Amino acid sequence: MSDIKTNKETHTQVSTDADNLTTTPINKTQCAIGQRLYFLPHYLGRAHAVFQNCLFYLAKQFLEPYDGGYWEFYHLSNGGFVMALDDDNTITVNSPNGSSATVDAETASIVVSLMTLSDLSFNLQTDSDELHKVVTSFHALREFALEHTNSNTILKLVD
């Protein structure tokens, strides 16, 4: 699966104060409906099914009021991905670290996705291809989260 068709590109402009440099923004592009079946295996290999089950479980545990829903899939321009709950309502994230915040669905989705990738990385065999894919996906999503409007809240909830 080398060519995944996408649509709906979203841009985030990021600039740093240090030396007045501008960094390249990480863009997200929605996965085409016909490519959804191949989306997670492309990024996570055989770990995709465990990731998805864990994501839904952690969403149920830590997101209020979550009881299932439709998730959009997005490719990130840095090689990563994000799954975002398609919901216009605010969601309260009750983090296992004791923090909580009421945020939009995308922010909540980033938080639970980072938690899931982190949790999954501890449960995969060392030096496996799946572990490498999960860790790479975690770091790519974390880079995207650092550029997000709610980056401080995301970091507070996943720390």
Feature-to-residue mapping (PLM):
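Amphipathic, interaction-prone secondary-structure segments
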Residues: 45-90
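Polybasic, proline/glycine-rich intrinsically disordered low-complexity segments
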Residues: 90-159
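Acidic-enriched, low-complexity/disordered segments with a strong bias for Aspartate over Glutamate
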Residues: 3, 17-19, 67, 72, ...
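Short, charged/polar micro-motifs that form catalytic or ligand-binding hotspots
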Residues: 30, 60-63, 96-103
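Short runs of predominantly hydrophobic/aromatic residues within well-ordered alpha helices
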Residues: 36, 67-70, 107-113
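Terminal domain-start segments
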Residues: 2-60
